[in-house]
């Protein structure tokens, strides 16, 4: 492995590369296009390469790994303190070379193409959900301007609106009926796309042994299991379960001064989409907590609910689900409700 460390500041068309030797002296300083960068990395002796996480960083990291380099992805907020003087692309690249060599630096795990595919499907589905909600609100708002009220929910829109648009005495002008048909057609196509994406995620979860094992955890279904796998893989980058819980942002924020610890609300750091799914799964268990009081998790939740607010109890349960998911991923076993020793959610 070469002693030179490369820091690359990524862009859409231009990439700024700074190389430093073991003493920290700059030995390379280049502004390159995409093809030129790939040629440089293919010809350069294997070395440590630092890249800030951004759009396209995962792809380039996999390419550079294929050339034999040791590639590390750094969160942008961890690089910023190393930027000296004015902010420009070369200074950013040099800051990356300094940050990547720190032994205590925290890196972003590299994702496989399969993980990126599942993550892209989740993001596209989330976009379609937002689009469906926006269309629903717009249709209801336009009709309310004409004195027509439709109940909330997708079912009412799906069943009431088609008949309303066909009625001659509905109070809608011909132009409004035509516009309503156009918006309803867009809504139906969006709904069909969401169903197709859901079917694809179900198929992926059935094909993945890890997803099937994760779904043995109470509160974890198709969406959450596939989202976990796409985000963290087999969780090998997390040494302990609490590290994964902290990465998801489901641990209390700590503010300690003068030796007096003080815990605040959850940090809400990391993957907000994954955190939301864990909280939704915890809320599903919260609804059924009184139905199965002998269940160990439900029994623990009932006892916690007697001492804490419902929202706090739900977040605590979501934290527990994250830890259980880590144990299932690292152990290679399914979740066993009555297994209290051995692989614990946190050691």
Which residues does each PLM region occupy?
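A detector of single, family-specific signature residues
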Residues: 1-347
């Amino acid at each position: 492995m070469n002693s030179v460390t490369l820091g690359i500041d990524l862009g859409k068309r231009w990439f700024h590369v700074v190389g430093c030797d073991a003493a920290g002296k700059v030995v390379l300083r280049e502004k390159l296009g995409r093809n030129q960068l790939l040629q440089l990395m293919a010809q350069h002796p294997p070395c440590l390469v630092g890249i800030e996480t951004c759009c396209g960083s995962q792809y380039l990291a996999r390419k550079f790994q294929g050339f034999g380099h040791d590639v590390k992805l750094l969160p942008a907020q961890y690089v910023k303190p190393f930027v000296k003087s004015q902010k420009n692309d070369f200074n950013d690249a040099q800051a990356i070379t300094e940050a990547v060599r720190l032994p205590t630096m925290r890196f972003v795990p590299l994702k496989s193409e399969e993980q990126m595919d599942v993550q892209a499907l989740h993001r596209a589905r989330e976009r379609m959900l937002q689009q469906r909600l926006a269309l629903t609100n717009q249709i209801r708002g336009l009709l309310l301007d004409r004195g027509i009220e439709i109940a909330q929910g997708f079912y009412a829109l799906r069943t009431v609106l088609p008949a309303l648009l066909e009625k001659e005495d509905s109070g809608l002008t011909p132009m409004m009926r035509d516009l309503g048909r156009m918006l309803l057609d867009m809504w139906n196509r969006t709904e069909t796309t969401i169903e197709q994406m859901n079917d694809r995620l179900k198929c992926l979860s059935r094909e993945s042994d890890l997803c099937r094992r994760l779904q043995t955890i109470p509160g974890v279904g198709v969406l959450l299991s596939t989202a976990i796998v796409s985000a963290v893989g087999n969780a090998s980058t997390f040494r302990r379960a609490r590290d994964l819980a902290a990465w998801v942002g489901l641990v209390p924020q700590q503010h300690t001064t003068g030796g007096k610890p003080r815990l605040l609300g959850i940090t809400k750091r990391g993957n907000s989409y994954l955190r939301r799914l864990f909280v939704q799964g915890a809320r599903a268990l919260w609804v059924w907590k009184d139905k199965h009081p002998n269940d160990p998790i439900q029994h623990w939740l009932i006892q916690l609910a007697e001492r804490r607010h419902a929202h706090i109890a739900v977040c605590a349960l979501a934290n527990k689900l994250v830890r259980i998911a880590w144990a299932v991923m690292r152990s290679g076993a399914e979740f066993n409700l009555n297994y209290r020793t051995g692989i614990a959610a946190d050691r």
